[in-house]
C-alpha cells in the first residue's frame, strides 16, 4: 500500500464549544487545563456565521457543547438559527441550569436531540464527583422532563475506577428513567482526565466485570425491549490497537472553541501546531487549506511502524494527541498500539491502576482555581 494525499470531503459534523464556563467540577473533563485563560467567547452573530459557512460546505449535524452550553443566554437563538439552516441539532448538557420552561423554548426553536450526563447512580457519589450537592436531583428531574416533551431519552455516564463497580445500578437508573439510549463511556484520558489518570483508570478486572454486566443486561433487554441501545465504551489503555480518532484527522469532524479556534478534534489545541481562527479565515479555507487541518491528514506523515502497517487505513495512526501527551511528540505512533516502541507507557499505566490508592478527594477538580495553576494570568 502506497502513501497518498487524501481525498478531502467536507466536514459532516460541527461541534460548537460555546463556552468553558460550567457550574460543575468534574475531574475527568476533556476541556483544556488552562481553560481559565480563555475568557473570550464568540458572539451570537459570529456563531451563526460559523453555522452558515459550515452548512454551505455540507455539514449536517451540529452539536452544542462546552463547559455547560446552558450558561449561554443566546442558546435558543443559536438553536433556531441552526434549525433554519437545516442542521440536525444536539445539545450535550449536564442538566444544571435546565428548566421545563427552557426545554419548551428549545423545542419551539427546533432542537432535535438532548443528551444529559450523570456522574453516578446515587446522590452521594454524584455530588462527590460533580462538586455539587444539588446536581443529582436536578438531573433526575430534567431527564424526566426531557422524556415528557417527547425527546429521545439519551443518558451519558462517564465511567472510571470510582463508579464503574456500580454499573448495574447505573443501568437500573437508566431503565427507571425509561432511557432510549445509554452511553456508558469509560474515561478517555485527555484534558483533566489525563491529569487525574492515576486516580481514574479502572483496573482490567473492573473493565472485564463491567463488560459482563453490560452483556447480561443486553441479553435481558433483548427480551423485554426496555432500552433501545446500550453502548459500552472501553478505555484505550486496555486495547492493543488504537482507535481511528474522529474518523481520521480532518476527515468528517470540526470543533470550534469558545474563542473561535477551529480544531480537527477536541484535544488538538494542546499540540505544538498553529490552528486557525474563524475570526481570521473562513471555514472553507480552514478545512481545505490550513496547515493545522492538513498536518495529519492521510498517511504520508506517519512514522514506522505505522507507515508500513496494513491497518493504517483503519486506525489512521491512532491519536496524535495521545502520542503527544504520552511521548512528547505527536508524530510518534500512538502508544496504545502494541507495535509502538512507546507501548511501555501504556503498560506502566495499567500497572499503576493496580497499585494506586488515590481517593476521590485526592483528584484535581476542574475549576477556575486549579486551572489558573496552568497558566500565568
From Swiss-Prot:
It comes from the Bacteria. GO terms for biological process: pyrroloquinoline quinone biosynthetic process. [4Fe-4S] cluster binds at residues 22, 26, 29. Its EC number is 1.21.98.4. Pathway: Cofactor biosynthesis; pyrroloquinoline quinone biosynthesis. Its cofactor is [4Fe-4S] cluster. It catalyses: [PQQ precursor protein] + S-adenosyl-L-methionine = E-Y cross-linked-[PQQ precursor protein] + 5'-deoxyadenosine + L-methionine + H(+). GO terms for molecular function: 4 iron, 4 sulfur cluster binding; cyclase activity; iron ion binding; oxidoreductase activity; S-adenosyl-L-methionine binding. Binds 1 [4Fe-4S] cluster. The cluster is coordinated with 3 cysteines and an exchangeable S-adenosyl-L-methionine. It holds the Pfam family Radical_SAM. Keywords: 4Fe-4S, Iron, Iron-sulfur, Metal-binding, Oxidoreductase, PQQ biosynthesis, S-adenosyl-L-methionine. CDD domains: Radical_SAM, SPASM_PqqE. Residues 8-224 form the Radical SAM core domain. Interacts with PqqD. The interaction is necessary for activity of PqqE. Catalyzes the cross-linking of a glutamate residue and a tyrosine residue in the PqqA protein as part of the biosynthesis of pyrroloquinoline quinone (PQQ). Belongs to the radical SAM superfamily. PqqE family. PANTHER family: PQQA PEPTIDE CYCLASE, RADICAL SAM DOMAIN PROTEIN. This is PqqA peptide cyclase. It comes from Pseudescherichia vulneris. The gene is pqqE.
Amino acid at each position: 500500500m502506497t502513501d497518498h494525499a487524501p481525498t478531502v470531503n467536507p466536514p459532516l459534523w460541527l461541534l460548537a464549544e460555546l463556552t468553558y464556563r460550567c457550574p460543575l467540577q468534574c475531574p475527568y473533563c476533556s476541556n483544556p487545563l488552562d481553560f481559565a485563560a480563555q475568557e473570550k467567547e464568540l458572539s451570537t452573530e459570529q456563531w451563526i456565521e460559523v453555522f452558515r459557512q459550515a452548512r454551505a460546505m455540507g455539514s449536517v449535524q451540529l452539536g452544542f457543547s462546552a463547559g455547560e452550553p446552558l450558561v449561554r443566554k443566546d442558546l435558543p437563538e443559536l438553536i433556531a438559527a441552526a434549525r433554519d439552516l437545516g442542521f440536525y441539532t444536539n445539545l450535550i448538557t449536564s442538566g444544571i441550569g435546565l428548566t421545563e420552561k427552557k426545554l419548551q423554548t428549545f423545542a419551539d426553536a427546533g432542537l432535535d436531540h438532548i443528551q444529559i450526563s450523570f456522574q453516578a447512580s446515587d446522590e452521594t457519589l454524584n455530588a462527590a464527583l460533580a462538586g455539587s450537592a444539588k446536581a443529582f436531583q436536578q438531573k433526575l428531574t430534567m431527564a424526566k422532563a426531557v422524556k415528557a416533551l417527547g425527546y429521545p431519552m439519551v443518558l451519558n455516564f462517564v465511567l472510571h475506577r470510582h463508579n464503574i463497580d456500580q454499573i448495574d445500578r447505573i443501568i437500573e437508573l437508566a431503565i427507571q428513567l425509561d432511557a432510549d439510549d445509554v452511553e456508558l463511556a469509560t474515561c478517555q484520558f485527555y484534558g483533566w482526565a489525563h491529569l487525574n489518570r492515576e486516580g481514574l483508570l479502572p483496573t482490567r478486572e473492573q473493565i472485564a466485570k463491567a463488560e459482563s454486566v453490560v452483556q447480561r443486561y443486553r441479553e435481558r433487554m433483548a427480551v423485554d425491549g426496555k432500552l433501545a441501545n446500550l453502548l459500552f465504551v472501553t478505555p484505550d489503555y486496555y486495547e492493543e490497537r488504537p482507535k481511528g480518532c474522529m474518523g481520521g484527522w480532518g476527515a468528517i469532524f470540526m470543533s470550534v472553541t469558545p474563542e473561535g479556534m477551529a480544531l480537527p478534534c477536541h484535544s488538538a489545541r494542546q499540540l505544538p501546531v498553529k490552528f486557525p481562527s474563524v475570526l481570521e479565515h473562513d471555514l472553507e479555507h480552514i478545512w481545505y487549506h490550513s496547515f493545522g487541518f492538513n498536518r495529519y491528514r492521510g498517511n504520508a506523515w506517519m512514522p514506522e511502524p505505522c507507515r508500513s502497517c496494513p491497518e493504517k487505513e483503519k486506525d489512521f495512526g491512532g491519536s496524535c494527541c495521545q502520542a503527544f501527551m504520552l511521548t512528547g511528540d505527536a508524530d510518534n505512533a500512538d502508544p496504545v498500539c502494541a507495535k509502538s516502541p512507546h507501548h511501555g507507557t501504556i503498560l506502566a499505566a495499567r500497572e499503576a491502576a493496580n497499585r494506586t490508592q488515590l481517593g476521590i478527594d485526592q483528584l484535581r477538580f476542574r475549576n477556575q482555581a486549579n486551572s489558573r495553576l496552568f497558566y500565568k494570568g
